């Protein structure tokens, strides 16, 4: 005997399946952007800062310098790839300087372009200025194309780093846990690490917290002077002197 399911049952089954698919997609998005667990202890990590780009809009640095804002430094996006300069870079640097907030700059590293040309783009934009904290290189899969081998990515990143070092800059490497294990660990251990992580300890191979310089612990912070979410960071005290007392080789 053939059993014919009522249309209402079929619709209910389809609705359940769709709900499960939507829930799974939502969980993936939540995990990428919003799932944040550990928070740094304020007494252990008192020096806090943010990183910004044009996507953060018009930043009111006068508000950021207020004691209640709890912003002790700011990283400003400078360049990306071989020819892109963030439209807000110059003005953000000027405003940070006027507000007396220590400002570093960062370069978004592209997997698909030459490392030396990327270094030239960053160096030209910095114009020979010294920054404390020092320049950072943002290394992550997000925003980069697929299809590049680990060896090629590391080779291009090394070219970029070597060019900066040759000009007297001692850069940091910004990355997440996956990027650290795949690209940075064992290749750039001599450079200060800026790790993006939502767990404690921030770096799973560093339970004593002696190998990371900056910890980005949130993508959705709220601070005075910025409309919308902003990345939040803390400095590891054992790296504070190295980061904020000049980085150009003598």
Each model region followed by its residue ranges:
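Catalytic-site microenvironment of enzymes
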Residues: 98-101, 179, 250
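N-terminal Lys/Arg-rich, disordered targeting/topogenic segments
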Residues: 1-9
């Amino acid at each position: 005997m053939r059993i014919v399911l009522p249309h209402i049952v079929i619709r209910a089954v389809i609705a359940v399946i769709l709900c499960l698919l939507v829930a799974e997609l939502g969980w993936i998005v939540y995990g990428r952007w919003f799932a944040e667990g550990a928070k740094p202890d304020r007494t252990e990590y008192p020096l806090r800062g943010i990183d910004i780009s044009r996507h953060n809009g018009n930043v009111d640095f006068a508000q950021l310098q207020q004691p209640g804002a709890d912003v002790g430094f700011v990283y400003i996006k400078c360049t990306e790839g071989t020819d892109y300069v963030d439209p807000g870079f110059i003005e953000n640097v000027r405003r940070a300087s006027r507000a007396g907030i220590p400002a570093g700059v960062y370069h978004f590293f592209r997997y698909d372009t030459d490392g030396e040309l990327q270094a030239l783009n960053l160096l030209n934009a910095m114009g020979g200025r010294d920054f404390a904290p020092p320049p950072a290189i943002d290394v992550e899969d997000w925003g980069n194309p697929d299809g590049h081998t680990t060896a090629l990515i590391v080779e291009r990143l090394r070219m970029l780093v070597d060019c900066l070092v040759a000009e007297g800059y001692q850069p940091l490497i910004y990355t997440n846990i996956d990027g650290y294990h795949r690209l940075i660990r064992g290749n750039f251990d001599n450079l200060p690490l800026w790790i993006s992580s939502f767990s404690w300890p921030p770096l799973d191979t560093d339970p004593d917290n002696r190998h990371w310089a900056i910890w980005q612990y949130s993508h959705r912070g709220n601070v005075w002077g910025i409309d919308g979410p902003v990345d939040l960071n803390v400095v590891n005290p054992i790296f504070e002197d190295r980061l904020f007392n000049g980085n150009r080789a003598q």
